[in-house]
Regions:
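N-terminal Rossmann-like FAD-binding beta1-loop-alpha1 element of flavoenzymes
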Residues: 7-32, 196-201
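Hydrophobic residues in beta-strands of the RecA-like P-loop NTPase core, especially within AAA+ ATPase
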Residues: 10, 33, 153, 189-190
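Acidic, glycine-rich active-site loops and adjacent beta-strand->loop/helix elements
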Residues: 13, 36-38, 193
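Rossmann-like NAD(P)H-binding beta-loop-alpha module
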Residues: 181-201
Length: 201
């Protein structure tokens, strides 16, 4: 038997989770369907922006800016720091901690506002009795949800380039670039969106 809601939001990124919370605050029974899994294979709300986009790139950018300030700017303030080193593992650990805290914060807001959260890939499959039918697949399991209103907030994915395989070794997507454990000597960035520009920084 299908679970029934007033509003179903497909996508748990910044557009989706905010819409779901607001719908619930306005008194609609609301569910958010999201398929994202973190590198450990666990569901993680927040979409590309939080998990493999704007937030982690800003965290790493801040670490890089701090390193640059120690190397080049602190002396102007009368602060001398010797033997400054980069610990990329620690930088990545900090970045991952920021992601985890923010994802947990979204889950808390869902609970506080009574937004149901279903993990899996949501797909509109039709209408029945004035309601939209949504099939949610997670691994080998499928369930059905019905909702009077549907908000599609599925975000984006990196665009594949013809004849170029993303192996996350030499050719990286945003997720691979944000997990690099060594600083590359050279890096070419294709794309001038927010993530691309921050990678170039």
């Amino acid at each position: 038997m299908s679970q029934s809601f007033d509003v179903a939001v497909i996508g748990g990124g910044p557009g989706g989770y905010v819409a779901a919370i607001r719908a619930a605050q306005l008194g609609f029974s609301t569910v958010c369907v999201d398929a994202f899994k973190n590198p450990q294979g666990k569901p993680s709300l927040g979409g590309t922006c939080l998990n493999v986009g704007c937030i982690p790139s800003k965290a790493l950018l801040q670490s890089s800016e701090n390193y640059h300030a120690v190397q080049h700017d602190f002396a102007d303030h009368g602060i001398t720091v010797a033997n400054t080193q980069i610990d990329i593992g620690k930088m990545l650990e900090r970045k991952n901690g920021i992601i985890s805290k923010n994802a947990a914060g979204i889950a808390f807001l869902f609970k506080k506002n009574k937004v149901a959260n279903v993990h899996g890939l949501g797909k509109l499959v039709g209408r029945q009795n004035e309601k939209w039918l949504i099939e949610v697949t997670d691994g080998g399991e499928t369930q059905q949800i019905e909702a009077t209103h549907v908000i599609v907030a599925t975000g984006s994915n990196p665009r594949p380039l013809p004849g170029v395989e993303v192996d996350n070794v030499r050719v990286l997507d945003n997720a691979g670039a944000l997990a690099l454990d060594q600083i590359p000597a050279r890096l070419g960035v294709i794309g001038a969106g927010v993530i691309g520009l921050e990678m170039g920084s």
